[in-house]
């Protein structure tokens, strides 16, 4: 959790990042103690349905401060709890049975600085873009017996002084999304994936099986353009890393591969 608090501190000027509640309603506020920020320009946080836990803490904090625009799935995963892992082998003395596994015990729940939990609800994106998980139940809310959503008192924080013109940003973004054929194709693919997951048809004759397999292959080809989409995003390593590339070819290869993956976002 400390890592995500430090990360948020790069973009906000001192203040609470997340609240943690334990048994007995004890509340602890995790704060960025450092004055000043490393970057004060426009900021976007990309999320999807699998963004969970620490990534939700970061997205929620920057959203509450009005510091960033959250873009991605309708909501993130919705994991707002903290677990401790207790190895059973450390508890039972003279154990001759080998590894006994471990217990994972939920001990805490974390909350946004505005007071609401990310449990179940996750973080709602400001700008929603479909992806392959859009019509698949993958969140905490879709699990058996999840802890409920609740809220506590808001922490004392000061919103970002350079407030974003959300109305203008959302309007222009929506217009671009509606005109983007790739977004429409992505939504179509997401619906198709969901339909295939729900289809439990079992073909008992070889001819029907082969025909269905060929149909699926042809249908999937219609979405190949998505893998070739050029985001036109450019990435470069920080100067101190670039100076290391001449001596560390492995580091350079890792960064090149990472930048290539980032460009697909």
Model feature map: region roles:
Residues 1-152:
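Conserved acidic, small-residue-rich alpha-beta core segments centered on
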Residues 112-265:
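Conserved functional hotspot residues or short segments at active or partner-binding sites
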């Amino acid at each position: 959790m400390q890592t995500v608090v430090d990360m948020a501190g790069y973009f906000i000027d001192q203040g609470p990042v997340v609240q943690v509640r334990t048994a007995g309603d004890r509340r602890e506020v995790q704060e960025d103690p450092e004055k000043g920020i490393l970057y004060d320009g426009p900021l976007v946080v990309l999320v999807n349905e699998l963004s969970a836990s620490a990534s939700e803490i970061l997205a929620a904090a920057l959203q509450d401060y009005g510091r960033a625009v959250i873009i991605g799935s309708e909501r993130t995963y919705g994991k707002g709890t903290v677990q401790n892992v207790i190895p059973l082998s450390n508890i039972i003395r003279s154990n001759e049975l080998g590894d006994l596994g471990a217990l994972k015990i939920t001990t805490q729940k974390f909350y946004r600085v505005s007071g609401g939990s990310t449990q179940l609800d996750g973080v709602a994106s400001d700008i929603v873009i479909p992806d392959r998980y859009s019509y698949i139940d993958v969140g905490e809310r879709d699990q058996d017996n999840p802890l409920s959503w609740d809220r506590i008192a808001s922490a004392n924080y000061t919103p970002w002084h350079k407030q974003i013109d959300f109305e203008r940003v959302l309007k222009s973004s929506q217009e671009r999304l509606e005109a983007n054929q790739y977004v429409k194709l992505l939504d179509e693919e997401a619906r198709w994936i969901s339909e295939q997951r729900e289809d439990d048809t079992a073909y008992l004759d070889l001819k029907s099986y082969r025909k269905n397999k060929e149909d699926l292959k042809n249908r999937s080809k219609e979405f190949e353009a998505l893998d070739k989409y050029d985001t036109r995003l450019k990435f470069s390593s920080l100067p101190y890393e670039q100076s290391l590339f001449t001596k560390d070819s492995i580091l350079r290869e890792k960064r090149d591969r990472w930048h290539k993956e980032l460009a697909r976002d």
